[in-house]
């Protein structure tokens, strides 16, 4: 296995996008570093996809490695940060595994995209395989313009548009598959608030969109696609 070099910065340090000194550690994976150093801020630059647990939360970081200049860091509890520049496609954040239909998700932070990006509650189910997004904010591209509209509903102080799209032979939690995406897109963008996820599950069901009965991970996520930006978020 190829040995990767990762950087670890102390919790009290300024995030690694500054010139603050860091300790360099050799490890074969992000998971190994989390196990060896659970109480530090983890920073990963241009890293391969990885999942695991950190400070009591599940995390996921996926990238297509298409020239990605992406820095992903994790702090205490549910805190995580991204900075990216001229990235390929990436998505990641912190949350839970498995997810569930009744979770109330609280989050706060800052989100500053330049180009195509989403801030969303994000996850997967199986049987059937479904990728879902509750988009709380986005950059230059509104996903509601590229999917089939199934109506709208009100939750947590805003109207959300319901959408569905199909991805053909694309990456998934089960490898390359064809699957549907369910979307709720908030009209009033925000970077802090509460998502009552059951409201979205019910609205999707009423629109004929049924999630699978096997829950995989469920996270607050930042996604970027050939864009730049920064985000620092905490999920609770």
UniProtKB/Swiss-Prot annotation:
GO terms for biological process: xylan catabolic process. The active site is at residues 131, 223. Its EC number is 3.2.1.8. It is found in: Secreted. Residues 46-236 form the GH11 domain. Pathway: Glycan degradation; xylan degradation. Its main location: secreted. Glycans are attached at residues 39, 106. It catalyses: Endohydrolysis of (1->4)-beta-D-xylosidic linkages in xylans. Disulfide bonds: none annotated. One of its GO terms (molecular function) is endo-1,4-beta-xylanase activity. It comes from the Eukaryota. It is an enzyme of class 3 (hydrolase). GO terms for cellular component: extracellular region. Keywords: Carbohydrate metabolism, Glycoprotein, Glycosidase, Hydrolase, Polysaccharide degradation, Secreted, Signal, Xylan degradation. Residues 1-45 form the signal peptide. The keyword Glycoprotein applies. Belongs to the glycosyl hydrolase 11 (cellulase G) family. Endo-1,4-beta-xylanase involved in the hydrolysis of xylan, a major structural heterogeneous polysaccharide found in plant biomass representing the second most abundant polysaccharide in the biosphere, after cellulose. This is Endo-1,4-beta-xylanase 3. It comes from Pyricularia grisea.
